[in-house]
Structure formats: C-alpha cells, structure tokens
C-alpha cells in the first residue's frame, strides 16, 4: 500500500514536470532556428573574472548516487576558481547541505522547488542569471 502511494506521487510529479519539458523543448527548437550565435551577446566569448555555479540536486535522498555524483563533480569544477571569483547557488536541499557542510559560501539556495514544480519558478531563476550575465556582473554561468 505504501509503495503504491509512493509510486502514485512519483507519477504525479512526472506529470507536473511535463509542461516544463514541453516549454524547454519549444525554446530549444526556437533557438536553433532563430539565433545567430555570432551576434547574440549570450554566446559572447569574454575573459572569466566572476563565475556563478548553479548546483541542481534533489531535496531528499533515496535516489542512489545521484546527489553525491553531482556534488563531487561540481566540487572538482569549483577547484578551478578562487573564492573571490566564484558564486555558488544551489537548487535543492541536498546540494545546499553538501556545500554548506564543507564551508563553501552558498550565496543563494532554492529549496522545495520540486515540491510544487512550475515552469514560472525555473524561468524566474533563469531570467535572473541571464540578466546578471548580460549586465556584465558575471562572466560565466555554469
């Protein structure tokens, strides 16, 4: 009975994520047709003085090595930057807990994003990061 309830919740979560995936698919298709990478400032090649790393993990465990693998991979990427040139943003509680416990300064954390997954929330995060990149506040978003 408990397993059936968990399965149903997982199926509901997948259904809730479907509009997000459809928007993303449409966006990528539109970009491929309409964007000239040479003229678009998002694709500009510039020296990296300040980077933002966005870590997306789950809020809870029970997904095998998923969260740990992501965090270890990100940690190896963080070693390429100095503390002054790096900003760490986490989406999901597991990533926040991992980096916070290792004395990394997490500038921003988005927990419980997956509880009520909506395209508008993901879009808000992406718009904020894009605006910071285009304004020159940061030179790379990973």
Task: Set out the residue ranges of the language-model regions.
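Conserved loop-to-helix interface motifs that mediate assembly, gating, or partner/ligand docking
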Residues: 1-142
